[in-house]
């Protein structure tokens, strides 16, 4: 019997995001919160560059449900604070970025850095520590090349570390490439994806749909990991992806 959509794997283009993941930087198994593509409109055509999946520690579900249970998927999608609560919540997160089109590490890190710095400056929190963290971040990516199917993994600890890992074929790496101890950077990387100016509205909507269903059915993250879960509305979309 297949898993209900709110805890099932998600396919974005030809890339599958498993229902659970255990990345470098944590001893815990995380559940898939949602996934979607990132792209841009170029000459009237939507061009997809990456597929993005956001995973959450099991404790994230009851933690978020205290405030957000009872809200519809539409309400969650439109709520800036809901996504801030995911970004800043006291639980571990994993963000996986898989390339649909080839990209150099320099191209990727420069764009992420630009978004992070813009967020910090708008919040009045850009200082020497953040500047040095960005330098380290760019150094980690400086000699990387990402062909289609290659993945970047960011494990974000609530204690402030950002663990960065790479995989050329999309499988989960066993060893981290770098760890940067800077909580604002760890949060800003995820903020740049699902925040108010996040680069993947598809991933945001997928998160809202799946989490609202988990809240509604009183499902905890541990049940999602073990498969002891049933979701009332099994017709909900697994994500918003183009065929």
UniProtKB/Swiss-Prot annotation:
Chain residues that bind substrate: 50, 115, 192
Superkingdom assignment: Eukaryota
UniProt xrefs under Gene3D superfamilies: 1.10.890.20, 3.50.70.10
Annotated positions for site Important for catalytic activity: 108
Gene Ontology BP, a term: flavonoid biosynthetic process
Top-level class of the enzyme under EC nomenclature: isomerase
Recorded catalytic activity of this chain's protein: a chalcone = a flavanone
Enzyme Commission number(s) from the entry: 5.5.1.6
Keywords tagged on the record: Flavonoid biosynthesis, Isomerase
Role: Catalyzes the intramolecular cyclization of bicyclic chalcones into tricyclic (S)-flavanones. Responsible for the isomerization of 4,2',4',6'-tetrahydroxychalcone (also termed chalcone) into naringenin.
Family of the protein in this entry: Belongs to the chalcone isomerase family.
Name the UniProt record assigns to this protein: Chalcone--flavanone isomerase
Organism: Ipomoea batatas
Gene: CHI
